[in-house]
Structures are given as C-alpha cells and as structure tokens.
Amino acid sequence: MGDERGDGRAGRFGGRIALVTGAGSGIGAAVARRLADQGAQVFAADVDGAAAATVAGELPGSHALTMDVADPAGVDRAFTAASAAHGRLDVVVHAAGVDDPAAKEWLAEALLDDRPPEVTTRLGDDAWRRVLRVNLDGTFHVLRAALRVMVPRRSGAVVTVGSSSAFDTLAGYPHYAASKAGAHALSQAVAKEAIAFGVRVNTVAPGPTQTGMAQRTPAALRRGLAGPRVRPYAAPEEIADIALFLASDDAANLVGAVLLANGGRFTV
C-alpha cells in the first residue's frame, strides 16, 4: 500500500485499524509495536489493563483496552468499542494465552530425577478448565467477535497465535497441547467459512519464545528445549513478523494456514 505514516514514510499497514489481544507483553506487545511501526492504528488489549496502557502509550494513535478473552461479553464490548471508534477493524491478531506453571514444575522435577513425568493423574479439573477456557474458548470468542465486525464489510485479516505444542507436545503437558490443537482446528474451520465473506484467518505456531511465559519455565525444562542442533529461543519480534506477514496483503492467498515457527525442533 502507498499509505503514509505519521513520520512521512509509507507503511505496509498505513491507514489500517488493528486490534491485538495479549498486547501487554510478549508476542502480543511485539505485534502491537510492529503494526504501529508499519502505519497501523492499534488497539492494545490485555487482561492486564495497566500493561496494555503502557504498550499503547508508546504507540502514536493507539488505545488500550482491558479485555479477558475468557469472558465473551467482555470480548464483545472491547470489539464494539474498537470498531465504533473508526467504523471498522482491518486486522486482528489474537496473541493472548496462558500456560500452567505448576505442571511445568512437575515436568522439571521429573527431568531432574531422571524419571518419566506423571502429570495427567495429578491434573485437577480447575487447572484443565483454566487453560482450555483461555486458550480455546478465548480463541472462539475473539474469532466470533472479529467476524461480526469484518463480515459485513467483506474485508479483514485475523491471525491467531497457536503453538508448536499442538503438533509435538512435551510429555506431561496434555491440557496445553489440547488447547492449542483445538485452537488450530478452530481457526482452520473458521477460515474456510470466513473466506467466502472476504475475511482471511491464519495461524502462526511458535516454538519456544523469549516471553514472560518462557521466563516462568523452570531452568531444567528450558535446557531440555534447547540444543546445538536447533535455533535458540525465538525473540517475540521474530514471531510478530510472521504474524504481520499473515495479516498483510502479501499473504492474500493464504487461508487457514498454520505456519510452524519452531527453529527446526521438528517438521510437519
């Protein structure tokens, strides 16, 4: 596009309105910054409203939204407010998600003790539902809200952030793997429906990435995910760049794609 940014330079997303979930930190924050740097006006949404406000405060013309993706009414309110401000949303990147620090500790303990992990028998319903509620239900809430805004205009691009764990999970991390595999399948199913209305939906599936979630991962487990034959943990900006590609006109022929970005740990 030939749109001009505020600094006079053309931006790939110049003149576009974007909403990013999980924008208070990690991949979401990197996506919000990249979009703003390339000309978009960004709504930075996060369950941590203060973190969202901090990121939005760095970005010209951007706004913060407090939004819990597990709360469908809250998601609808946020999307309504964002779309009402400009009459549309052109790009949505859904990067919000959670892990399970307790399960990671159990995995690390098993690794240090040189024994097989036993997590499923210890996993409570509350822990299972928390991960599925945010990672899978939250993806549905965001996709539904995005399509409600984009379908009437017959235009838009949605990118969901999945995980390489959907393909090859750690032994002993079943709820996270299930949530991300479900989110991938959901995104692909919605993509096949939405393209008839001019809306593209795609997914980026990162491997280990240097985020707050990774920092909470026990050191023993982090070492197990590293190695000389693979790339180091990705920077959030590397994953953000893939998300921006999927959201851009350069990816116009990609619909329902799941791009694996795991540094060579495995292929599919």
Model-predicted regions and their roles:
Residues 163:
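Residue(s) in the substrate-gating loop at a strand-loop-helix junction
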Residues 195, 200, 254-256:
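Short, small/polar-rich loop/turn modules that mediate ligand/substrate recognition or access, typified
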